Amino acid sequence: MAIQAIPIVIAIALFLVNLIDLLTQTPAAPYAWSLVLSGGVVIASIVPLGAARSQANFTMSDMKAPRAMFERLPAWGQRASWAHQNSFEAFTLHAPAALLALLAVLQMGPLGGLAIPAALLQPVLRLVYLPAYVANVPPLRGLCWAGGLSCTGILYLEGLRALIAGA
């Protein structure tokens, strides 16, 4: 059985190599993709919340006060709601950082340091954060939250450093 998994592992590795190549074809690409993928994470956070609402007997009359049904959600559904809200908060911090880095690259050229890995890692960490929060795995959730916030901070620092150095 382990031998049968080898082609799958090789295919996944080749896919990841090609994906990284696609995401880094131009100096600005990682930051643009980071912005797009981070927005995708916000949209993805709706899925577990929608699943939870479907178990809480959501009706059209709940549209009058959608937050009022929160108490009817199962515990994991309440965590899904919090994860969804936190996704918006993380995006509002990350989007300006990604735009700043994108602007810095367009004005000054490629950024140094950890800017590209931070730009690509932030959406991945935020995507892992969602199931970690919904499944109530605090250590993983905390690591993903801190890692994503650190990636956003790196983008702010590298973008500002480039713009200040070029001024």
Model-derived regions, located:
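Short alpha-helical packing/oligomerization segments
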Residues: 96-124
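Core segments of transmembrane alpha-helices
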Residues: 8, 39-42, 85-101
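Cytosolic, membrane-interface loops and tails of multi-pass inner-membrane proteins
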Residues: 50-81
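Long, highly hydrophobic alpha-helical transmembrane signal-anchor segments
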Residues: 2-49
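Interfacial loop-to-transmembrane junctions
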Residues: 127-151
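Small-residue-rich segments of transmembrane alpha-helices in multi-pass membrane proteins
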Residues: 7-11, 144-158
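Transmembrane alpha-helical segments that form the membrane-embedded catalytic/substrate-channel core
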Residues: 37-55, 123-130
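Juxtamembrane boundary at the C-terminal end of a transmembrane helix
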Residues: 155-167
